């Protein structure tokens, strides 16, 4: 007979939890001297509820992760069913049925030619794996090309916080302190926004592609891969690339024999209106990096998809030393795979992508009305994401002193109106779960507008 478990101790009150939070938790991307706790206790669809019962629209999809809302019945059931079987098995030389099925389903929905799936734990890890695979691929290609060791990256790119991802990242405030630990990529200006360090406007589509071609020609035989966020650079401040840029990059990288790594950690799984952003321009990369929405925001999991051509370069007897000696303890975790499978089922069975155009148009209509606001310098909108850039003046444009944190103030003010938002500098970002209703979009945009009005007054 099993012993009766002891009763749970009563949960500490909200004030005690907040004190423990300040004392013990080091929050990511947060200046802890200024941190004020907000403790989220539960979620309901597009809403989050704190320990005091206050409700907030999840306007950032819990850091761009949540797809179908919180506590979706099918996802909850899939997680519970898998936990009743096994919660974790290693992916190092072992597998499980759920992870195998998930890999197969990912291949089915991914762009053509991406047939192999390497699982890891988060977006940085997905990019890190792609960089290392691309580097090792050229060493083991037939014939080997040992000189292909360079990577091409884009200005203001963000690919994560592990060292390889930091190296190809271009957001200076995130990466500069770690520069001595990393390698130097070949950096191209972004076609999506004004360079913050030089003030130079984004080059045109033609100029951007011509520059890429000159770089690839000047570095013939030296470039392993180009890595980029397709269509939309999220952490740069919601920078949107001109239509045709991605397709042009694919044509040029293929022409010069350079692998193309697309980082869809943020923009994959319906965010731009198609399942993957690269499908907007019918582009199939050599690597596709996925995380965040991979499990619809339920569990940390990532995947790096690549081609059979790349995979074959790693096959051989053990003594040939062709193995990819890289991996993480929780790569291919069956709990994450189970929820990921259920998420793909929801996309298919609930017509998620088919239902997006009306929501996208509602979001566009709301943010467009802010264009005349005296302190809204620019609005950038694509799919189910919008960036509203604040400025001290519009003509000519004058940025607020960065120390004033106007974007953060706008988001904190929006919180008082029932929405949780997170800015990118002075860009107020709207990035709700795809499941958000039209009425909830109205409420989210009203809260954001109120926050902007309060933060820019006076």
Show where each model-derived region lies.
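Conserved N-terminal phosphate-binding loop of PLP-dependent enzymes in the Aspartate aminotransferase
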Residues: 2-458
